[in-house]
């Protein structure tokens, strides 16, 4: 899954990074109904979007728009995040400095990513997401997951979501997702980000 060319460029540009991957990823791809080509998702510790221009100039990558590329040799999609985990203007978790030192999200950060990213991006949990969450929730979830999820969604929504996942209930209503998105608008300057995206 590691793309050597991408990481060579990041090292040359001196951009710290944290790969978004978990210990149950490989097993989870087996439950999809069709052949699944895993993406490379990576958080960069930089406010500069200069890396977008750098990758655009490389023949090894095709630009897909926004912060996404396709690596030509392996036909792998690459999605870049900057400093935090987000879906559009919904920034829900600032990545800890230690994750950039380790070049990988912490398990707590990754679990939160698995909880929120699918419902914000797809409005559902695909089989691969369900598989991963079931495996993580088979053990006691770290307290930090609940704390950080509450800071993003508030106690009521966070508790409701954790209970559903603990019970292997992955049916999330559109109304519940709208409530989550509304709550997220009022953290991390997301409301301003939304206004800017709509005005400009």
Positions of the model-derived regions?
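Conserved NTP-donor binding/palm subdomain of two-metal-ion nucleotidyltransferases/polymerases, i.e.
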Residues: 1-200
